[in-house]
Curated annotation (Swiss-Prot):
Natural source organism: Rattus norvegicus (Rat)
Site (Is directly targeted by the spider protoxin-II): 821, 826
Tissue: Expressed at high level in the dorsal root ganglion and at much lower levels in the brain, sciatic nerve, nodose ganglia, heart, thyroid and adrenal glands and Schwann cells, but not in the cardiac and skeletal muscles, brain and liver.
II repeats: 725-988
Residue stretches of biased makeup (Acidic residues): 1135-1145
Gene that encodes it: Scn9a
Function: Pore-forming subunit of Nav1.7, a voltage-gated sodium (Nav) channel that directly mediates the depolarizing phase of action potentials in excitable membranes. Navs, also called VGSCs (voltage-gated sodium channels) or VDSCs (voltage-dependent sodium channels), operate by switching between closed and open conformations depending on the voltage difference across the membrane. In the open conformation they allow Na(+) ions to selectively pass through the pore, along their electrochemical gradient.
SMART domains, per the entry: IQ (SM00015)
Modified residues (Phosphoserine): 1488
Residue positions with a glycan: 209, 283, 1350, 1364, 1373
Residues passing through the membrane, by range: 126-145, 151-172, 186-204, 211-227, 242-267, 377-402, 745-761, 771-795, 805-821, 831-847, 865-887, 940-966, 1186-1210, 1223-1248, 1251-1276, 1286-1302, 1316-1340, 1430-1455, 1513-1532, 1544-1565, 1575-1596, 1606-1625, 1639-1661, 1732-1757
Protein's name in the database: Sodium channel protein type 9 subunit alpha
Post-translational modification: Phosphorylation at Ser-1488 by PKC in a highly conserved cytoplasmic loop increases peak sodium currents. Ubiquitinated by NEDD4L; which may promote its endocytosis. Does not seem to be ubiquitinated by NEDD4.
UniProt keyword list: Cell membrane, Cell projection, Disulfide bond, Glycoprotein, Ion channel, Ion transport, Membrane, Phosphoprotein, Repeat, Sodium, Sodium channel, Sodium transport, Transmembrane, Transmembrane helix, Transport, Ubl conjugation, Voltage-gated channel
Feature: compositional bias, Basic and acidic residues: 26-39, 489-509, 1019-1035, 1916-1930, 1960-1984
Length: 1984
């Protein structure tokens, strides 16, 4: 790492001409160097700029203060990277770094010219940016004016002037564009430049449409981003996530195009079908009207309109489409609905319709229109689009954004780690300089009794030399003295807040002299280690605390924010507000005194007992007097007054931990044992002191920087805010304290809060006077109680302490507001103040962890979302202004197009507020309706562009970022372990006390009764036993002095707590004594059992809790195995578990009754070995065998399905179909008997015990009971009784029995049941959250939604005619068609308020509610148009908090819960390292494949040629291109095209048909009968046949079937095959892969959803079949038949249009409905609904389907997406294995799975990378040591395995995986078993080499013999002879050398042998033999 220059003021050097000359010299030296070693340069990476010294960042703290003369002056660059670049830096007062280019600006201003220097000074001054900021904001305000007055023109010029001035200054200071750091090199400056250029252009050049150009001024608002520092990063993140979205976008557009094509083919022109009047005037015919009608207006009078609708009623020609009323016929005429914008007539409109479907905006309307015009069967199209398009693609976008966010987070964490290391090195260097001095000084201070004053003097003398200090030491000294004199007496007051405070006053200014030697070093170390540990728990990595930290450790600002945001919501002293940021950002990370710091103390690691002498903490105090410990935690005292050793857990995982420890040891040895004389020598001591004071002052500096407030504040606080006047007062205070702090008081207050909330919730609209008075008195009482609580707490704790606790501040605010409200209660318009009382509800969070967590998550997200919200606000603002500037005028001018009365509609863009509302509505996902209006008044293109931009930028990206943040705050570990506080547990203590009291009473009673019966008390032993754990208090009480405990009231609480939890605690904490002390805050030990799933401590999690979780797991296992009693289609558990789960004797039933029963009633016990008992036992065994038989189960499943199916027939037409009715009645009886029989059989077989301990059996039991009761009632003739009727509807639950029978569904249900607790929790929290809005709504709108309407057309009377209720009643008496009516969904009471809020939150039916609210005037007054316009704000706030946050919380909770469940079930991934995962996944893929037999090449030459052509990749791609072209021609088609176009398209179509037929024929010729072995080929064949038939019989087919062209669209799916060939399409492949992976899970969820829909459809049919047809219920969409109910329910699954279906059901009495109406053909009377049933029905369905099932869908997709992305980044993917087998097929045409050794080299060279081994590859292949079977053949698996290993590298897990894989493969291909390997490639090579060596040796031997025997004449001949073999050998040796011997060796030695151990030797041996052979060979050569 390039070290930074030595920190401190010396590092600042003025930038002078010499500096410039030096830089130039360096540059020339560099260039000279570069010429010398050009080659080297490529290899090495150059230095990188330091990220802490980037322009725009704060100067790192380590540099200290800037010397006064150097502020705003050019200085030499501090970053070594720029040493040879022409740059200099300037620092402003705020220590921000500005970097400039040192070349002359604009070629004339050098860095030393006065003009440039002045420009630089202006530019870096903070006021300059403030001025620009203010200008921008003022400018924004002016832009929002819709009709600006004349004088604003001049203001405009001023703005332009200021912006020009700003740019001029920047250009003068920086230069224009040549070189780094000049004006145009910063992209943000481009924005300024463009804005200014446009300003001048529009002013001086006449460009026609000025308003469009003027909208460019809006971009000025974007400048805020460049001025505010945090925003740039967020925008960066946004841009990143948009980049990541590119793949999803491509996929989305592709899918939408395909769907749009299908829509175009199916529904072209259908939406023009309208109901046309039959009776025409004499001379009129249909044709004549069509031809003569010039405009839509003329046709209108002939069409049929439903009341209140703009468009004519649609109809269709098929039987299941919408029919026309009497007197009308269905005709295709006029334009499409919604101004003609909703249609499938051309590809573009179809695409828009599908985009709308995907975003689910008002899609129910499109759905209803299409089904009405085309027929109900087309529901299938919508199901596919909604599930694939909408759910899948939209959630993929979410997944991608979340991952981008997560990656960014990871990157930040990495960067932080890096910083930490650099920082460590830097500090080490500082330490070395100051270490000895420090040690000596500290020792001197401790061991001598020199007067304070001398020390002070010394430190003063040294402060001049201090490099870092800049504050006067005198100030500090004086303050220190004063502080010391003020040591207060009444400190140690038991309360833990007092404990933390006690350290504050005295040691605030204690110098580091008071720290022990080690203590002093520790301040340093603490600084390093604390940031690493999460402030809330030890859980997770070292850096978990920095999870959200964005900035570096060095920078002063910013870091604190992140830490603060992660801490406890309520007790966070370092709140996120105010200017304390710079204080909190310092290098110290404060220890939070009021939090459980699990991470500081343990007894695991000990360090020598060196501690601050006085045992006080070094601490700093902020404005509220909050103490932040700077040094370690408080010293712990032993009873004898000694100090306990302080212990630090170094739970470090990074590399610095080791060094820290060594340093600590080294330092201790050197510094602690100082020589005596050194201490006694005053001179030495003085020197030590002066050097040490340097550091001292640094520490002081830090503390000052961390102080929130000026010193006088502390003096004031200690004088006035701590009340210790007289001893009596103190006694009184203690008494009050004892009372107020008692848990029972807390319980009482909590009960009061709940009651108060109830009282507030009881307000409703028509209230009696008495009720009002009761509520008023109640309010007074509660206000009194809370005020009293506050006063008493103030007395008990002193204001100083009282306001340290977040909750207390909160309480005091609410009490104050309540009191103010009491006095202002009668003032008109202040009733809103009452809603402040509602905040009391939040006090519940104190004792309700989930609510607390929710608030924390919202707090956290708001912290992190602060910047994001700003960006969102800027985006909304920009678009609102753009809309207003572009379309405002058009709305005014063309308003008659969209409104008959020519008044502006509610949604328009004529002024800023309304424009803002439209943009906000688009962000909520409702864009299509306002867009139609916009397109109608302002033209299509501009509106489409603007709306799409808002939609994509705003809705998709920002809202998803919102979600990503929510999810990340969920997954961050510190929230899963809910932070328990002392207060939070007070309730539990109280409850425990009550329980104990009850138990005690029970016990005494029992003993008393037993005594009175004079029996020996049985229970005494038990009680002793249970009381026992409480005697082990040592477990729970960590080291605190007994003295302290007796003082501490909290201890008393502990006692209660501990004994209260008794045995449960005992279980979980029995063997954790060692950890006990650091689970909790050292000064307070509260033990709360932690659930194994959510424990804070990983250490505990691993071993201690394993026993616990095991028991959980086995329970789970038991449950699972027991589910077979009610279903034998059961999941076999993996491996060993299966054996465990089976009963001892599989075919014998268990005992009938539980042991308890048998003990009570001995008669239950039967002897089964003889007599009746034996017969009974035989019967039971027989029953058991029957029930356990698989056929029995299948039969029952069939019966369940049949009986459920039977329910679907009972619709309103059943009365007309008599035979079906009779059949159903009999069937019903039969089913009931069968199910009763099944139940009895199971009772006999399993016994009651087993049957009734199984939840699924209970379900069966209850459902059978219902059938039984209805059966009995029917036979007795009571079938028409009300209760019996409602019981009959419960039969709808029958399908639930299918749940336990289908594995897939059961898995989903189990997962859901697991999630229910957390879902309920979140639901409750949401209800509390919404309660506040609901009560507020009741206060604002109760009784104000009434209006006086004209019942004939439903219009409202204007206020001029009817002003209030009494006038309306007067009118009613005059005419019959007037009515004073209320909105059905209103805020008249809290319950209805909830319903209204649900409609607002799901954005369905919210418009009516909002309009009523905005128009409301007063109770009993007629509403007035937009009278209370700003009531919109109430809804906006609710949507943000109530809808976005809480509904997204559901997603968060479900996903989080699934992950936790996965952990509990022990998903393999949790226990695998990254390496193992890689191998595991590769194996998973390998095992599933096997070589296939390729289609053999035909022998015929001609066929062979065609075969080669057809199997070529190019052929495939060509066909693909043709398919795409065919699609394009299909896109060109449109409704009503010319005949010529028809003709052209017809011939193009013919060409395509001929081409595809040609392809088909070619393939048939070459592939022969093998053609039909491939699925796609069959599909193509069918399409071709249909197309040919279709050419001749087009009319007929289209009339009766779907048009055959549709099948061609499906062929697009073939694109999936081509994606494999395109390397760039990896991202899209990943997405599709994720979809494939999710399909099984999604299918299960779909099944479950279908089941839910089925049950609800049956319920709906029996309850709402006869309701009045209005709003959403009409002739097609209703609950009359099963099909119609399903159509309605599918629509509500996405929560679309449920308000319309609910509205008619809310009609409960005339005049809304007619209770006496007769329905012909049925006995039912009336068409009124049942409001309560209706509301329950729809709300429960929405919660189940919309919130739960749909969110499970999301969870699955997110999960699989992350898995798929992981897989795509792995070195070997599925495709590589596919490729391997494709190549294999060529080498092994008969699919023998073996290949000859001789072919291996070619095979390896034929593969694609990464498996490819290019030639020459012989040696590498030999070294792989592959097993061979007879005939020198090698198995494909062995080859693949070896190649895989080569790619992945060696891993220890290989062997086990290998065997797993083989097992898998064997089961897939039994053929392999017969071949046992005989040898291996390596062994074969060794044998060959050995053979040659033996041969050679033998030859030599023969040769020698020869030489001896024969005379020298023959020697030449012999030589020539001998050369032959030698030549061969040398050739082989050469080969060996050329192919890099190292490589061979490495592979040989690193690759482990395969699993055929019998054949091969172990590695080591093999390697050695290799070596010896080589040596032999070399010896041979040398011999020769």
């Amino acid at each position: 790492m390039a070290m930074l220059p030595p920190p401190g003021p010396q590092s600042f050097v003025h930038f002078t001409k010499q500096s410039l000359a030096l830089i130039e010299q360096r540059i020339s030296e560099e260039k000279a160097k570069e010429h010398k070693d050009e080659k080297k340069d490529d290899e090495e990476e150059g230095p990188k700029p330091s990220s802490d010294l980037e322009a725009g960042k704060q100067l790192p703290f380590i540099y200290g203060d800037i010397p006064p003369g150097m502020v705003s002056e050019p200085l030499e660059d501090l970053d070594p990277y720029y040493a040879d670049k022409k740059t200099f830096i300037v620092l402003n007062k705020g220590k921000a770094i500005f970097r400039f280019n040192a070349t002359p600006a604009l070629y004339m201003l050098s860095p030393f010219s006065p003009l440039r220097r002045i420009s630089i000074k202006i530019l870096v001054h903070s006021l300059f940016s403030m001025l620009i900021m203010c200008t921008i904001l003022t400018n924004c305000i002016f832009m929002t004016l819709s009709n600006p007055p004349e004088w604003t023109k001049n203001v405009e010029y001023t703005f332009t002037g200021i912006y020009t001035f700003e740019s001029l200054i920047k250009i003068l200071a920086r230069g224009f564009c040549v070189g780094e750091f000049t004006f145009l090199r910063d992209p943000w400056n481009w924005l300024d430049f463009v804005v200014i250029v446009f300003a001048y252009l529009t002013e001086f050049v006449n460009l026609g449409n000025v308003s469009a150009l003027r909208t460019f001024r809006v971009l000025r608002a974007l400048k805020t981003i460049s001025v505010i520092p945090g925003l740039k990063t967020i925008v960066g993140a946004l841009i990143q996530s948009v980049k990541k979205l590119s793949d999803v976008m491509i996929l989305t557009v592709f899918c939408l195009s395909v769907f749009a094509l299908i829509g175009l083919q199916l529904f072209m022109g259908n939406l023009k079908h309208k109901c046309f009047r039959k009776e025409l005037e004499e001379n009129e015919t249909l044709e004549s009207i069509m031809n003569t009608a010039e405009s839509e207006e003329e046709l209108k009078k002939y069409f049929y309109y439903l009341e209140g609708s703009k468009d004519a009623l649609l109809c269709g020609f098929s039987t299941d489409s919408g029919q026309c009323p009497e007197g009308y016929i269905c005709v295709k005429a006029g334009r499409n609905p919604d101004y003609g914008y909703t249609s499938f007539d051309t590809f573009s409109w179809a695409f828009l319709a599908l985009f709308r479907l995907m975003t689910q905006d008002y899609w129910e309307n499109l759905y209803q229109q299409t089904l009405r015009a085309a027929g109900k069967t087309y529901m299938i199209f919508f199901v596919v689009v909604i599930f694939l398009g909408s759910f899948y693609l939209i959630n993929l976008i979410l997944a991608v954004v979340a991952m981008a966010y997560e990656e960014q987070n990871q990157a930040n964490i990495e960067e932080a780690k890096q910083k930490e290391l650099e920082f460590q090195q830097m500090l080490d260097r500082l330490k070395k300089e100051q270490e000895e001095a420090e040690a000596i000084a500290a020792a001197a201070a401790e061991f001598t009794s020199i007067g304070r004053s001398r020390i002070m003097g010394l430190s003063e003398s040294s402060s001049e030399t201090s490099r870092l200090s800049s504050k006067s030491a005198k100030e500090r000294r004086n303050r220190r003295k004063k502080k010391k004199q003020k040591m207060s007496s009444g400190e140690e007051k038991g309360d833990d807040e007092k404990l933390s405070k006690s350290g504050s006053e005295e040691s605030i200014r204690k110098k580091s002299f008071h720290l022990g030697v080690e203590g002093h070093h520790r301040t340093r170390e603490k600084r390093l280690s604390t940031p690493n540990q999460s402030p809330l728990s030890i859980r997770g990595s070292l850096f978990s605390a920095r999870r959200s930290s964005r900035t570096s450790l060095f920078s002063f600002k910013g870091r604190g924010r992140d830490l603060g945001s992660e801490t406890e919501f309520a007790d966070d002293e370092h709140s996120i507000f105010g200017d304390n940021e710079s204080r909190r950002g310092s290098l110290f990370v404060p220890h939070r005194p009021r939090e459980r710091r699990s991470s500081n103390i343990s007894q695991a690691s000990r360090s020598p007992p060196v501690l601050p002498v006085n045992g006080k903490m070094h601490s700093a105090v902020d404005c509220n007097g909050v103490v932040s410990l700077v040094d370690g935690p408080s010293a712990l005292m032993l009873p004898n007054g000694q100090l306990l050793p302080e212990v630090i857990i170094d739970k470090a995982t990074s590399d610095d931990s080791g060094t820290t420890n060594q340093m600590r040891k080294k330092r201790l040895s050197s510094s602690y044992f100082l020589s005596e004389d050194m201490l006694n020598d005053p001179h030495l001591r003085q020197r030590a002191m002066s050097r040490a004071s340097i550091l001292t002052n640094t520490v002081e500096e830090l503390e000052e920087s961390r102080q929130k407030c000026p010193p006088w504040w502390y003096r004031f606080a200690h004088t006035f805010l701590i009340w210790n006047c007289s001893p009596y007062w103190i006694k009184f205070k203690k008494l009050i304290y004892f009372i107020v702090m008692d848990p029972f008081v807390d319980l009482a207050i909590t009960i009061c809060i709940v009651l108060n909330t109830l009282f507030m919730a009881m307000e409703h609209h028509p209230m009696t006077e008495e009720f009002k008075n009761v509520l008023a008195v109640g309010n007074l009482i509660f206000t009194g109680i809370f005020a009293a609580e506050m006063v008493l707490k103030l007395i008990a704790m002193d204001p100083y302490e009282y306001f340290q606790v977040g909750w207390n501040i909160f309480d005091s605010l609410i009490v104050t507001l309540s009191l103010i409200e009491l006095f202002l209660a009668d003032v008109e318009g202040l009733s809103v103040l009452r809603s402040f009382r509602l905040l009391r509800v939040f006090k519940l969070a104190k004792s309700w962890p989930t609510l607390n967590m929710l608030i924390k998550i919202i707090g956290n997200s708001v912290g992190a979302l602060g910047n994001l919200t700003l960006v969102l606000a800027i985006i909304v603002f920009i678009f609102a202004v753009v809309g207003m500037q572009l379309f405002g005028k058009s709305y005014k001018e063309c308003v008659c197009k969209i409104n008959v009365d020519c008044k502006l509609p509610r949604w328009h863009m004529n002024d800023f507020f309304h424009s803002f509302l439209i943009v906000f509505r688009v962000l909520c996902g409702e864009w299509i309706e306002t867009m139609w209006d916009c397109m109608e008044v302002a033209g299509q293109t501009m509106c489409l562009i603007v709306y799409m931009m808002v939609m994509v930028i705003g809705n998709l990206v920002v809202l998803n970022l919102f979600l990503a943040l929510l999810l990340s705050s969920f997954s961050s570990d510190n929230l899963t372990a809910i932070e328990e506080d002392t207060d939070a547990n007070n309730l539990q203590i109280a409850v425990a006390r009550i329980k104990r009291g009850i138990n005690y009473v029970k016990q005494t009673l029992r003993e008393f009764i037993l005594k009175s019966f004079s029996k020996k008390p049985k229970g005494s032993k038990d009680t002793k036993r249970t009381a026992d754990p409480n005697n082990k208090k040592e477990n729970y009480i960590s080291n605190r002095t007994l003295a302290e405990m007796s003082k501490d009231h909290n201890f008393l609480k502990e006692k209660d707590r501990i004994s209260g939890y008794g045995s449960s605690l005992d279980k979980s904490f029995m063997d954790e004594n060692d950890y006990q002390s650091f689970i909790h805050n050292p000064s307070l030990t509260v033990t709360v059992p932690i659930a194994p799933g959510e424990s804070d401590l990983e250490i505990m999690n691993t071993e201690e809790l394993s026993s616990d979780s095991d028991s959980d797991y086995s329970k789970e296992k038991r449950n699972r195995s027991s589910s077979s009693e009610c279903s034998t289609v059961d999941n076999p558990l993996p491996g060993e578990e299966e054996a465990e789960a089976e009963p001892v004797n599989a075919d014998e039933p268990e005992a009938c009754f539980t042991d308890g029963c048998v003990r009570r009633f001995p008669c239950c016990q039967v002897n089964v070995d003889s007599g009746k008992g034996k017969v009974w036992w035989t019967i039971r065994k027989t029953c058991y065998r029957i029930v356990e038989h698989s056929w029995f189960e299948s039969f029952i499943v069939l019966m369940i399905l049949l009986s459920s199916g039977a329910l679907a027939f009972e619709d309103i037409y059943i009365e007309k179909k008599k035979t079906i009715k009779i059949i159903l009645e009999y069937a019903d009886k039969i089913f009931t008997y069968i199910f009763i029989l099944e139940m009895l059989l199971k009772w006999v077989a399993y016994g009651y015990k087993t049957y009734f301990t199984n939840a699924w059996c209970w379900l069966d039991f209850l459902i059978v009971d219902v059938s039984l009761v209805t059966l009995v009632a029917n036979t007795l003739g009571y079938s028409d009784l009300g209760p019996i009727k409602s019981l009959r509807t419960l039969r709808a639950l029958r399908p639930l029995r299918a749940l336990s029978r289908f594995e897939g569904m059961r898995v989903v249900v189990n997962a859901l049941i697991g999630a229910i607790p957390s879902i309920m929790n979140v639901l409750l929290v949401c209800l509390i959250f919404w309660l506040i809005f609901s009560i507020m709504g009741v206060n604002l709108f109760a009784g104000k939604f009434y209006e006086c309407v004209n019942t004939t057309d439903g219009s409202r009377f204007p206020t001029s005619q009817v002003a209030n209720r009494s006038e309306c009643f007067a009118l009613m008496n005059v005419s019959g068609n007037v009515r004073w009516k209320n909105l059905k969904v209103n805020f008249d009471n809290v319950g209805l308020g909830y319903l209204s809020l649900l409609q607002v939150a799901t954005f369905k039916g919210w418009m009516d509610i909002m309009y009523a609210a905005v128009d409301s005037v007063n109770v009993n007054e007629q509403p007035k148009y937009e009278y209370s316009l700003y009531m919109y704000i109430y809804f906006v706030i609710f949507i943000i908090f109530g809808s976005f946050f809480t509904l997204n919380l559901f997603i968060g909770v479900i996903i989080d819960n699934f992950n936790q469940q996965k952990k509990k079930l022990g998903g393999q991934d949790i226990f695998m390292t990254e390496e193992q995962k890689k191998y595991y996944n590769a194996m998973k893929k390998l095992g599933s494949k096997k070589p296939q037999k390729p289609i053999p090449r035909p022998g015929n030459k001609f066929q062979g040629c065609i075969f080669d052509l057809v199997t070529n990749q190019a052929f495939d791609i060509t066909i693909m291109v043709l398919i795409c072209l065919n699609m394009v021609t299909m896109m060109v088609e449109k409704e009503g095209q010319t005949e010529y176009m028809d003709y052209v398209l017809h011939w193009i179509n013919m060409v395509f048909i001929i081409l595809f037929t040609g392809e088909c024929v070619l393939k048939l010729i070459s592939l022969r009968h093998y053609y039909f072995t491939v699925g796609w080929n069959i599909f193509d064949f069918v399409v071709v046949i249909l197309s040919i038939v279709g050419m001749f019989l087009a009319e007929m087919i289209e009339k009766y079937f779907v048009s055959p062209t549709l099948f061609r669209v499906i062929r697009l799916a073939r694109i999936g095959r081509i994606l494999r060939l395109i390397k760039g399409a990896k991202g899209i492949r990943t997405l599709l892969f994720a979809l494939m992976m999710s399909l099984p899970a999604l299918f299960n969820i779909g099944l479950l959803l279908f089941l839910v829909m089925f049950i609800y459809a049956i319920f709906g049919m029996s309850n709402f079949a006869y309701v009045k047809k209005e709003a959403g219920i009409n002739d097609m969409f209703n609950f009359e038949t099963f099909g119609n109910s399903m159509i309605c329910l599918f629509q509500i699954t996405t929560s679309a249009g449920w308000d319309g279906l609910l509205a008619p059901i809310l009609n409960s009495a005339p005049p809304d409905c007619d209770p006496k109406k007769v329905h012909p053909g049925s006995s039912v009377e009336g068409d009124c609904g049942n409001p309560s049933v209706g509301i329950f029905y729809f709300v429960s369905y929405i919660i189940i389907s919309f919130l739960v099932v749909v969110n499970m869908y999301i969870a699955v997709i997110l999960e699989n997406f992350s898995v798929a992305t992981e897989e795509s980044t792995e070195p070997l993917s599925e495709d590589d294995f596919e490729m391997f087998y494709e190549v294999w097929e060529k080498f092994d045409p008969d699919a023998t799975q073996f290949i000859e050794f001789c072919k291996l080299s070619d095979f390896a060279a034929a593969l694609d990378p990464p498996l490819l081994i290019a030639k020459p590859n012989k040696v590498q292949l030999i070294a792989m040591d592959l097993p061979m079977v007879s005939g020198d053949r090698i198995h494909c698996l062995d080859i693949l395995f070896a190649f895989t290993k080569r790619v992945l590298g060696e891993g220890g897990e290989m062997d086990s995986l290998r065997s797993q894989m083989e097992e898998r493969f064997m089961s897939a291909n039994p053929s392999k078993v017969s071949y046992e390997p005989i040898t291996t490639t390596l062994k074969r090579k060794q044998e060959e080499v050995s053979a040659t060596i033996i041969q050679r040796a033998y030859r030599r031997y023969r040769l020698r013999q020869h030489v001896k025997n024969i005379s020298s004449i023959y020697i030449k001949d012999g030589d020539r002879d001998d050369d032959l073999p030698n030549k061969e050998d040398t050739v082989f040796d050469n080969v060996n050398e050329n192919s890099s011997p190292e490589k061979t060796d490495v592979t040989a030695s690193t690759i482990s042998p395969p699993s055929y151990d019998s054949v091969t030797k172990p590695d080591q041996e093999k390697y050695e033999t290799d070596k010896t052979e080589k040596e032999d060979k070399e010896k041979d050569e040398s011999r020769k």
